[in-house]
Amino acid sequence: GEVEYGILPVENSCAGSVHEVYDLLMDGDLCIANSADAHIHHDLIGIKGTRLVEIKEVVSHPQALKQCAALISELGLSVIEMSNTAVAVKYVADRNDRSVAAIGSAEAADDYSLEVLKSDIATSRNNTTRFVSVCREPKRSAGADKISIVFSTENVPGSLYRVLAPFASTDMSLTKIESRPIAGSDFDYLFYADLKGDVTDPVVAGVLATLKMQLPCFKLLGNY
């Protein structure tokens, strides 16, 4: 079947950006339609009756492992990365080994008749993930005030400054910028940036149009 929207996690308050998703936004030719923040609750899950001292390794999605790094270090556990937390919980159930635990949800523990050995184990008590809804065609949300763009610059001194200067001169607030290496290039980078603004504002539209004309690569990911 076909779906109009997908949901992807782009950033976590503890572990930072999910770089693979940023790559997918560019490589998959996707646009951002909206965003929302959600509190993420992680539990340590194992065979019923397991004591923490019995656990030697923990399995989960890489982001969950990063978000729970303090407890993993405290218990001295080795880590194994899995494609998602549900797969990790199933892995523990299939292994039926007290030395292996998973990071996942209490619901997943119930599904596989496992036990929550320790609850809410994220390093940060305010463990929040930002999710975006994505689609193929650009869709501006009602009341949109956030703009996401991706661009590259020429590899010459001052090139990034010249990109950012128009934002300052027009009072456009830059809330985030980070770089990602371009695969197969010799230390060339894509820059992902979030701005405060609305593309229906003539000043904002003018700045973005100028950048699109001047830069080697420029894409408006979304206004939401």
Segments from the language model and where they lie:
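Domain-level signature for soluble enzymes in the chorismate/prephenate branch of the shikimate pathway
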Residues: 1-224
